[in-house]
């Protein structure tokens, strides 16, 4: 069986669904969208209810559930590396935090030769194009894009307000919009949730516009085995359907667009013969193109929680009890409101821990309950927690193919915490978080410190806690980086160096990880490259102002030292 299309997109995730939707706006263009997972079932509360965000990480229906190799600086732990599977990709299972990164992240990208048009003011129009913010558009936010963004509302949990106020009392700025003029500081956090209280994954936002188009073919349960080449030109894809072993071939008249994410995109390229030649030869894979950067430069965000008991019964601890969940579910299902309609990450912040950082190097997410991100080990009392993590670790990892079997997971190593800077940032971060939590705004609520615990104070004690308890924020990226140096995989339009008709468009092409969650930026990148693929003029540069700290101190005088 063989089919022919103008474009074949491999992976219906945050980037692939954007490309599929935008490319098929041109009626004379045909697109095949291949997704290894299944549909994004709208009746499955696990992926549709924002408060149920821990559920899709459990099991393998929606999660590839990768694991790292033993991480040498983390007590040789094999660490989780969850990635989304199904229409929507990781936007179907993520925490729904709508954070774009710092303006200076993109200005930093634009300093690289060939990436000059990735500055913040070049990217901002595409962030706006993708977004519909529920309180309306402005210079920073869109009003008619496919991604629904919900802002925190008056009357939400008092712990959110107390935690933001504590950050301000600790001497840090207040910001009304973490995606607006100033990211630095503490404030409300937007979320990718529809006005009806449903998860706003890219299957809902983008694909729902495009599903009925005759020029779009979507195949689920289609695991791409390898890209097919004629010389150095990509001409198609061989893929497996369901549990079958008989490959199906599809041909691409124009381009193959790899949108499989930071783990699977380099894995697919390597399996197809594009990657480090020595690795490919070891696996008896014919080398189509020796490209040493494929799978290198792997980056992620690591985070840990500081947990506190809550003296007042205002946390969402009761919602973790099964006997309260039917009422919460019914309110969400029928009214689109209540606890179920929020991811419960409604406040957060970004700070600089030292003057050496030009823009924030630590991110906070505040949660009005004390529980693990994956829903396990909930503290059996009212509590709250701060998720704290460093943003631009100097540690670099890699993805290596283990075999030619498309169903075998690759070897993944992030080399977490492999630099002294990592340890310094996490020690600073824990100590500064404790200072924030000790401010008067939290006096009515703050009970004892549950984790790490007051007995964990010295550098050595903190380091041991970090080694044992830090975990991924699920932000793998940069493993097929954009650029022009010897380790770059793609150019500024996602075109694979040395190849024709082949692009990578997803979080793997970020040259450096951004300051914040990745989903919004991945969508923006796909919007931007979609215009390039279609031969359209880029959107005009924004003229919006944005904050640069310059000589501003990292913090003012705290209320309580």
Swiss-Prot record:
Belongs to the GMC oxidoreductase family. It holds the Pfam family GMC_oxred_N. One of its GO terms (biological process) is glycine betaine biosynthetic process from choline. GO terms for molecular function: betaine-aldehyde dehydrogenase (NAD+) activity; choline dehydrogenase activity; flavin adenine dinucleotide binding. This is Oxygen-dependent choline dehydrogenase. It comes from Pseudomonas paraeruginosa (strain DSM 24068 / PA7) (Pseudomonas aeruginosa (strain PA7)). Its EC number is 1.1.99.1, 1.2.1.8. It comes from the Bacteria. Pathway: Amine and polyamine biosynthesis; betaine biosynthesis via choline pathway; betaine aldehyde from choline (cytochrome c reductase route): step 1/1. It catalyses: choline + A = betaine aldehyde + AH2; betaine aldehyde + NAD(+) + H2O = glycine betaine + NADH + 2 H(+). One of its GO terms (cellular component) is membrane. Its cofactor is FAD. FAD binds at residues 6-35. InterPro entries: BetA (IPR011533), FAD/NAD-bd_sf (IPR036188), GMC_OxRdtase (IPR012132), GMC_OxRdtase_N (IPR000172), GMC_OxRtase_C (IPR007867). The gene is betA. HAMAP family: Choline_dehydrogen (MF_00750). It is an enzyme of class 1 (oxidoreductase). Keywords: FAD, Flavoprotein, NAD, Oxidoreductase. The active site is at residue 475. Involved in the biosynthesis of the osmoprotectant glycine betaine. Catalyzes the oxidation of choline to betaine aldehyde and betaine aldehyde to glycine betaine at the same rate.
């Amino acid at each position: 069986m063989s089919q022919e299309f103008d474009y074949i997109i491999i992976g219906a995730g945050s980037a692939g669904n954007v490309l599929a939707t935008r490319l098929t706006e041109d009626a004379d263009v045909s697109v095949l969208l291949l997704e290894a997972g299944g549909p994004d079932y709208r009746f499955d509360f696990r992926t549709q209810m924002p408060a149920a965000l821990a559920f899709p990480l459990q099991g393998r229906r929606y999660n590839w559930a990768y694991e790292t190799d033993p991480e040498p600086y983390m007590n040789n732990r094999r660490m989780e590396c969850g990635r989304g599977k199904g229409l929507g990709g990781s936007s179907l299972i993520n925490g729904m935090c709508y954070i774009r990164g710092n303006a200076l992240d993109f200005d930093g990208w634009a300093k690289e030769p060939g990436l000059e048009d990735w500055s913040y003011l070049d990217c901002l129009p595409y962030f706006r194009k993708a977004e519909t913010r529920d309180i309306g558009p402005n210079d920073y936010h869109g009003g008619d894009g496919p991604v629904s963004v919900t802002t925190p509302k008056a009357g939400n949990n008092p712990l959110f307000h107390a935690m933001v106020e504590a950050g301000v009392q600790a001497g840090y700025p207040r910001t009304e919009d973490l995606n607006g003029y100033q990211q630095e500081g503490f404030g409300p956090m937007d979320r990718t949730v529809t006005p009806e209280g449903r998860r706003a994954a890219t299957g809902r936002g983008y694909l729902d516009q495009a599903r009925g188009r005759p020029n779009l073919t979507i195949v689920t349960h289609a695991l791409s085995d390898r890209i097919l080449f004629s010389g150095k030109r990509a001409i198609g894809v061989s893929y497996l359907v369901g549990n079958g072993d008989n490959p199906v071939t599809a041909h691409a008249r124009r381009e193959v667009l790899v949108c499989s994410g930071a783990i699977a995109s380099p894995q697919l390229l390597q399996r197809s013969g594009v990657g480090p030649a020595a690795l490919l030869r070891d696996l008896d894979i014919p080398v189509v193109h020796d490209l040493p950067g494929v799978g290198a430069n792997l980056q992620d965000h690591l985070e840990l929680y500081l947990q506190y008991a809550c003296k007042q019964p205002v946390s969402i601890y009761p919602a973790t009890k099964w006997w309260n969940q039917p009422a919460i579910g019914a309110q969400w299902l029928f009214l689109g409101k209540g606890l179920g309609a929020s991811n419960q990450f409604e406040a957060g912040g970004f700070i600089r821990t030292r003057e050496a950082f030009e823009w924030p190097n630590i991110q906070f997410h505040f949660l009005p309950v004390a529980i693990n991100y994956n829903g396990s080990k909930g503290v059996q009392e009212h509590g709250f927690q701060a998720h704290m993590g460093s943003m631009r670790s100097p540690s670099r990892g890699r993805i290596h193919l283990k075999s030619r079997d498309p169903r075998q997971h690759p070897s993944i190593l992030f080399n977490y915490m492999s630099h002294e800077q990592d340890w310094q940032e996490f020690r600073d971060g824990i100590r500064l978080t404790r200072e924030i939590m000790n401010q008067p705004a939290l006096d009515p609520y703050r009970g004892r410190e549950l984790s790490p615990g007051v007995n964990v104070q010295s550098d050595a004690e903190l380091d041991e806690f970090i080694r044992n308890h830090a975990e991924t924020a699920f932000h793998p990226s940069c493993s097929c980086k954009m650029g022009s140096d010897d380790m770059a995989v793609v150019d500024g339009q996602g075109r694979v160096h040395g190849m024709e008709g082949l692009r990578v468009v997803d979080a793997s092409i970020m040259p450096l990880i951004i300051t914040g969650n990745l989903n919004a930026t991945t969508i923006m990148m796909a919007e931007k490259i979609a215009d390039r693929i279609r031969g359209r003029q880029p959107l005009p540069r924004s003229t919006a102002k944005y904050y640069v700290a310059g000589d501003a101190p990292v913090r003012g005088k705290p209320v309580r030292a």
